[in-house]
Design a protein with these regions (language model features):
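Eukaryotic scaffold repeat domains enriched in small/polar residues
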Residues: 1-177
Length: 177
């Protein structure tokens, strides 16, 4: 009937009582609500990875053909957690056109900026090495599918990879533990 339902997936609350929410089919970022329950703003929006081939086709396609192309939407957030200092930690899927992990874990400050330290040998995005194709049956391919995150009191954080059933724990500098 054309009705769009608000479908919240995860929430976190800071020390002042502000509520942060991620919802299905919300691409503008994490929603922040005042203590009164009124909407305040979006923060921490994921970026769209540019697809050069798609840009090329849009220059030569007709308007009808362009309309049939998939929209370039940023990846949705999959989970959020709040640490004791009021920073939001968030996980997201990789962009559909991404060929590498692209900051699928973020530490978001009150300005909405990602301030995650990524000083480790690999970025804190789950599996650093993975197969993209395989002819063998039963081989899992693709980047980690991050669906969960939690933060400890000392700043370590653990992410959950649903694809391979793994947990990855990192320190506050982004080093895998």
């Amino acid at each position: 009937t054309g009705v769009t339902l608000f479908n919240p997936q995860k929430v976190a609350v800071d020390q002042t009582g502000r509520l942060y929410c991620i919802a299905q089919n919300v691409y503008e970022g994490i929603m922040e609500f005042h203590t009164s329950g009124s909407f305040n703003r979006f923060l921490g929006k994921n970026e769209v990875v540019a697809n050069p081939l798609k840009k090329f086709w849009t220059k030569i396609f007709s308007e009808t053909q362009i309309a049939s192309l998939n929209l370039d939407l940023p990846p949705e957030f999959t989970n959020i957690a709040m640490d004791e200092n009021g920073f939001l930690y968030a996980t997201s899927h990789p962009d559909a056109d991404a060929t590498t992990n692209a900051n699928m874990v973020k530490m978001i400050n009150t300005s909405g900026k990602d301030i995650m330290k990524r000083n480790g040998y690999v970025t804190p995005d789950g599996d650093a090495v993975y197969l993209t194709t395989s002819t063998e049956e039963g081989v899992i391919i693709g980047m980690s599918n991050l669906v969960g995150i939690t933060v400890s009191k000392n700043g370590n954080f653990t992410i959950v990879d649903e694809l391979r059933g793994r947990l990855f724990t990192y320190d506050n500098e982004g080093n895998i533990i």
